[in-house]
């Protein structure tokens, strides 16, 4: 039974790599220019480890032991810790994003598959992919207290919180739904049917649209959430296994990984059209973009490698061997989201 649960998890990934809340609140986009490069973190879900990579030498400098099945990670609002969610050990590992030293482990957080802070920095939210609920925690700047556990649907996968910290959106991977939670009242506002196996999702800057990647299909669905009725306004064909999003950092484009097609599509958020494609082998999954916008880091899930793509030439420039089933990818030296 554990094998079956794990297999379902490997169909989900999020673009969880950095806190949009921290960026909005502090005005920062990672380490300061001129400082030593921050390490690059790659979560190895089947090794229960995090690979730490020196981006000046492209060597793995160490491998951090975490809890069971780390999938996603997220920066705290004060940027002092990056939190690794260990789904099968019900724990969170806090790591210094600059030194890669483990700071502490928080236990008793049930099945934290995906995680996110609200932009107002008051709430910390986790999706329990295996246990079919979403937990909402109060965040006091260093610790979390459970405020509400909300039963959702089958396999809540990824999370997105709007810029006003009023609505939490989540995909239901195995019931093919998009749901919205009212954060002030901590109740479900609505749910709509989606295409097959919705995974990652993201909102537009004006909070009017939600993009949903269909891992069981070959497209990104666009939902208009600005009015009283939620409508699917467009379907953007990207590639088989559309999975995770990463904003390019230019305020206009977003990337989506297509895990089965072994490609990454570039979407223009103004026209909602695909305007480019990158070839990335090995089942591209989670992504991060360097602060200068020149390179894309991609976890190649089935190849046990980190792939590095030159965004100017569109070419794969290197692959770095990491652990089993690499998933979340993140660095403090990231481009804006």
Task: List each language-model region with its residue ranges.
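Leucine-biased recognition of intrinsically disordered, low-complexity hydrophobic segments
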Residues: 11, 15-17
């Amino acid at each position: 039974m554990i094998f079956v649960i794990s297999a379902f998890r490997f169909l989900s990934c999020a673009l969880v790599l950095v806190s949009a809340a921290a960026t909005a609140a502090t005005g920062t986009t990672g380490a300061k220019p001129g400082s030593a490069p921050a390490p690059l973190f790659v979560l190895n879900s089947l090794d229960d480890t995090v690979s730490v990579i020196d981006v000046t030498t492209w060597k793995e400098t160490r491998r951090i032991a975490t809890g069971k099945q780390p999938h996603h990670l997220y920066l705290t609002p004060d940027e002092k810790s990056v939190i690794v969610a260990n789904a099968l050990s019900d724990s969170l590992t806090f790591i210094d994003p600059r030194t890669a030293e483990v700071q502490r482990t928080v236990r008793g957080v049930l099945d934290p598959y995906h995680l996110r802070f609200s932009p107002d920095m008051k709430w910390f939210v986790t999706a329990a992919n295996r246990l079919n609920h979403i937990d909402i925690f109060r965040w006091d700047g260093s610790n979390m207290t459970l405020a509400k556990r909300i039963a959702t649907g089958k396999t809540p996968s990824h999370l997105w919180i709007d810029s006003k910290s009023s609505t939490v959106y989540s995909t239901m991977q195995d019931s093919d739904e998009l749901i919205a939670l009212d954060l002030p009242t901590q109740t479900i506002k609505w749910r709509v049917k989606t295409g097959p196996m919705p995974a990652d999702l993201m909102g537009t800057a004006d909070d009017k649209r939600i993009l949903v990647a269909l891992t069981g299909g070959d497209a990104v669905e666009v939902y208009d959430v600005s009015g009283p009725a939620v409508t699917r306004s467009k379907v953007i064909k990207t590639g088989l296994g559309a999975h995770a999003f990463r904003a390019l950092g230019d305020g206009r484009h977003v990337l989506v990984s297509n895990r089965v097609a072994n490609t990454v599509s570039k979407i223009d958020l103004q026209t909602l059209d695909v305007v480019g494609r990158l070839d990335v082998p090995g089942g591209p999954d989670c992504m991060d973009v360097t602060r200068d916008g020149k390179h894309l880091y991609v976890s190649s899930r089935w190849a046990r490698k980190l792939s590095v793509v030159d965004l100017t030439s569109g070419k794969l420039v290197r692959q770095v061997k990491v652990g089993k089933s690499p998933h979340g990818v993140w660095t403090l030296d990231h481009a804006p989201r």
